[in-house]
Every structure is written in structure tokens, then in C-alpha cells.
Amino acid sequence: MNPRRKSRLSVVLFILLGISVASALVLYALRQNIDLFYTPTEVVNGKNNESHTKPSIGQRIRIGGMVVEGTVERDPKSLKVRFDLNDIGPSVTVIYEGILPDLFREGQGIVAQGVLIEPTVLNATEVLAKHDENYVPPELEAQMQKIHKPMGISDLKNESDRDRQEKQFKEGNQ
């Protein structure tokens, strides 16, 4: 092999090695930041009731479910909160220290992200409250009632006066 080919081959191999190392580092970083989503039943029993798919202790996960009524315990000296989450099966305890979302309450759906410290205990770093897509804050709803009712415009929850009058008119003409 002549020296020119040898130098080209070494440059190509060096570039391929660099790309391989960069790809490996990117994949390693992504693997560290992946938070798999589980329901409380899947945390306890594994996905599809297969025990080898259970999350391991120390793994970062996201868990979604309903806050079990009567399980919210707040520490009066700090922002620490402890509550249980469940779906249709067993419960998982969530420990969180921080300010909870305004929509957080018992019976409400939430998603908690954190590290599994015991088979059924999650140390959460983030808690998100779910709400339906038709949610309107009470202050905004009161404002909408004040503004839209006199105009006969629908307030997203009840039909407007104009809609009712049209319906009565159509029913009367049939």
C-alpha cells in the first residue's frame, strides 16, 4: 500500500472513529434522560403483568394516576407532601417536596416524575396536575358570564339566549 492511500485510509478511519464516539456519547446521554411512563398498576405488576418489565429501584420514571382520597399528608413545617396514586389496581406512594399545582386535589389526575426509591414509593421532583380541555378558571367564567350573557353569545357551557330563542322558533314552526 502506498503512503498516500495509507494516509487517506487513516483519515477516514479517524473520522469514523470520531463519529462512533460522538454517537455513543449522545445515546448514553439520551438514555440517562429517558423517563418511561408507568401507571401505578404497571409499577407494581410490570407492563402487561410481566414482572421483568417492572421499573427498578433508582430508575427515573413518570407515573400517572388519580390521587387517592384521604391519603394526602402535608408536613406543617415544610413543603413536603405524601400521597397515594392509583388507577384501577394497586396504589403507589408519592413523596414530593415543593409547591403543588393549583389544580392538585384528591381525586384529581396527576403525573409525577421522579426516582423510584422503593418498589411502590416514588420520590418526585415534579408533579403536574391534569385537567380537561374545557377547563375555564372561575374568575374567567364569571367575567364571561358578565360580558357574554347580555349579548346572547354562548358561554361555552350553556346555550345562549339567542340559541334557545332560535330553537323555540324552529320547534314552533314545525
Curated annotation (Swiss-Prot):
Membrane topology annotation: Single-pass type II membrane protein
Residues that bind heme: H131, Y135
Domain of life: Bacteria
Topological domains, Periplasmic: 30-174
Keywords linked to the UniProt accession: Cell inner membrane, Cell membrane, Cytochrome c-type biogenesis, Heme, Iron, Membrane, Metal-binding, Signal-anchor, Transmembrane, Transmembrane helix
Region (Disordered): 149-174
Record topology, Cytoplasmic segments: 1-8
Biased composition (Basic and acidic residues): 156-174
One GO term of the biological process aspect: cytochrome complex assembly
Subcellular location: Cell inner membrane
One function term, GO molecular function aspect: heme binding
Major location (coarse): membrane
Assigned GO CC terms: plasma membrane
SUPFAM superfamilies: Heme chaperone CcmE (SSF82093)
Family: Belongs to the CcmE/CycJ family.
Job description of the protein: Heme chaperone required for the biogenesis of c-type cytochromes. Transiently binds heme delivered by CcmC and transfers the heme to apo-cytochromes in a process facilitated by CcmF and CcmH.
Name of protein: Cytochrome c-type biogenesis protein CcmE
Organism: Histophilus somni (strain 2336)
